Swiss-Prot record:
Assembly with partners or alone: Part of the 30S ribosomal subunit.
Gene Ontology molecular function: small ribosomal subunit rRNA binding; structural constituent of ribosome
Cellular component aspect of the GO annotation: chloroplast; mitochondrial small ribosomal subunit
Originating organism: Lepidium virginicum (Virginia pepperweed)
PANTHER family: 30S RIBOSOMAL PROTEIN S18, SMALL RIBOSOMAL SUBUNIT PROTEIN BS18M
Alphabetical UniProt keywords: Chloroplast, Plastid, Ribonucleoprotein, Ribosomal protein, RNA-binding, rRNA-binding
Family matches, as Pfam families: Ribosomal_S18
Homology family: Belongs to the bacterial ribosomal protein bS18 family.
Subcellular locations according to the entry: Plastid, Chloroplast
Stored SUPFAM superfamilies: Ribosomal protein S18 (SSF46911)
Upper classification of the organism: Eukaryota, Viridiplantae, Streptophyta, Embryophyta, Tracheophyta
Protein name listed in UniProt: Small ribosomal subunit protein bS18c
GO biological-process terms attached to the record: translation
Length: 101
């Protein structure tokens, strides 16, 4: 290989493949709260397939299980915990502004 072509070749970097979030023995069920809670955001929304790194079939089963758990009130539909609380309230100025004509 001559020098001009060698500049454009990329070095092959080794990478470690991540473990799948659902193993073959895991059962996707509405009662398995430890598994289901991994696929829900802090606001209580179902995370997407790309974020979860699961297959389409697994994502469908997760969605069904989460919806069943919500209906049976095992999971909340929304998680409305206030993350930002006011430390001190600032008083507003009550002076009246008058227009000059």
């Amino acid at each position: 290989m001559n020098k001009s072509k060698r500049l454009f070749t990329k070095s092959k970097r080794s990478f470690r493949r991540r473990l799948p979030p659902i193993q073959s023995g895991d059962r996707i069920d509405y009662r398995n709260m430890s598994l289901i809670s991994r696929f829900i955001s802090e606001q209580g929304k179902i995370l997407s397939r790309r974020v979860n790194r699961v297959t389409l079939k697994q994502q469908r089963l997760i969605t069904i299980a989460i919806n069943q758990a919500r209906i049976l009130s095992l999971l909340p539909f929304l998680n409305n915990q206030k993350q930002f609380e006011r430390s001190e309230s600032t008083p507003r100025t009550t002076s009246l502004r008058t227009r000059k004509k």
